[in-house]
């Protein structure tokens, strides 16, 4: 299983309910805050159906926020399409972003690309760090073209970072497999967390590969949709837990994530 399984991690909300993390994949609405982002979803779904190659699931609306999480998973020969929906079932418009979180197994190494845009006199990339992240943390490694974050099961202290991911992919290597998540970046739209459409959270129990939609005002009875595409490749691994840039480039070319040598000039 490329995904983490965490049955112990849980948060107790002010009303006494418990939000279990569980691992795997989950849907949230962003920006993150407590307790709104941690409402328990450990209850039966409102509805589900199978339509051809697609599974469609609607959770029960959250009583406090009146937001309803929706999921449509479509199996395709080349990949899996995962559509994340946030529906406003309340009476007023709400601004938020859809947030897809894939919690990958302990020992995973996550790789994502920097920007290769030639913006002349203007900056072309940024990295965003959360307050509990130590910049010198050895689990993070930064190159010109790619960035690497490694999950160390012996390191419990968390870290989190994000970026404006213009390449639209992130990869997690674990168990001689590579899980790839594809997602969009809409240049003219505003994103949460200092303009992040990609984020990763790392702790001892696993590492998260997260994509975010643009911020959107969701009117009553309207659904905000955000799409991810997933691939899993078997029989592939990194040469070391913290590989060098040239090694990464060769592997990513093999996976079809890098088409040219633009990053390693």
Where would I find each of the regions flagged by the language model?
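Surface-exposed acidic/polar loop and edge beta-strand patches at domain peripheries
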Residues: 1-85, 89-265
């Amino acid at each position: 299983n490329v995904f983490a399984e965490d049955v112990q991690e849980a948060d107790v909300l002010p009303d006494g309910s418990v939000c279990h993390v569980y691992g795997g994949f989950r849907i949230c609405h962003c920006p993150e805050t407590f307790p709104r982002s941690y409402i328990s979803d450990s209850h039966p779904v409102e509805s589900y159906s199978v339509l051809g190659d697609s599974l469609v699931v609607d959770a029960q609306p959250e009583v406090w926020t009146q937001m309803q999480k929706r999921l449509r998973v479509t199996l395709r020969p080349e990949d899996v399409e995962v559509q994340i929906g946030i529906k406003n079932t309340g009476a007023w418009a709400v601004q938020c972003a859809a947030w897809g979180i894939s919690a990958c197994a302990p020992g995973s190494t996550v790789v994502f690309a920097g920007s290769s845009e030639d913006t002349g006199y203007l900056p072309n990339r940024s990295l965003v760090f959360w307050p509990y992240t130590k910049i010198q943390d050895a689990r993070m490694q930064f190159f010109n073209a790619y960035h690497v974050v490694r999950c160390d099961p012996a390191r419990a202290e968390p870290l989190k970072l994000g970026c404006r991911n213009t390449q639209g992919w992130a990869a997690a290597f674990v168990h001689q497999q590579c899980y790839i998540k594809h997602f969009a970046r809409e240049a003219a739209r505003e994103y949460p967390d200092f303009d992040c459409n990609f984020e990763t959270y790392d702790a001892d129990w696993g590492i998260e590969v997260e994509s975010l939609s643009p911020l959107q005002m969701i009117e009553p009875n309207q659904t905000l949709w955000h799409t991810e595409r997933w691939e899993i490749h078997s029989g592939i691994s990194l040469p070391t837990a913290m590989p060098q840039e040239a090694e990464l480039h060769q592997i990513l070319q093999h996976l079809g994530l890098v088409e040219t040598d633009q990053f390693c000039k």
